[in-house]
Regions:
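Helix N-cap motif at beta-to-alpha junctions
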Residues: 65, 102-108
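Surface-exposed aromatic
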Residues: 86-101
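Extracytoplasmic
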Residues: 53-55, 91-94, 117-118
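Bacterial N-terminal signal peptides that target proteins for export
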Residues: 1-8
Length: 129
């Protein structure tokens, strides 16, 4: 009898999983917002020669409100807010320039989560010029 219940539960689980709709196209579109070459960045978020690895800084802009800052801070613990600065990204009036770093745990997941926010149009490398 237990075997029948286990089999039924397994079939039900397979059916439920097959009905799940994962929006991979939307995630791929969001990832296009990230204009940073991460191919040479290691798992620690660093790139460069073994004796001179450095983190990659990136920038983006958000609406300049406490709510938007809190949402971004909840995703990216490295973020620094630079209200009034335009950056290379070209933050406009009413927007806040944000600068983050790949030197954090799961930096790719952080960038993916940021790119999924509808109010972030682009994320580019920051060169501090």
């Amino acid at each position: 009898m237990t075997h029948i219940y286990n089999t039924a539960a397994f079939i039900l689980m397979l059916f439920c999983c097959s009905c799940m709709n994962v929006d991979t196209r939307g995630q791929a579109e969001a990832w296009k917002k990230v204009g940073i070459d991460l191919s040479n960045v290691d798992q620690d978020g660093l790139r460069g020669p073994a004796d001179g690895k450095v983190a990659v800084s990136y920038e983006f802009c958000i609406p300049d409100t406490p709510e938007h800052r809190a949402a971004v801070r909840a995703i990216d613990s490295t973020v620094q807010f630079m209200p009034g600065s335009r950056g290379r990204i070209g933050a406009s009036k009413g927007q806040c320039l944000c600068i983050g770093s790949t030197q954090q745990k799961d930096y790719k997941a952080v960038l993916r989560s940021l790119s999924n926010l509808p109010y972030i149009a682009r994320i580019i490398e920051c060169y501090f010029e």
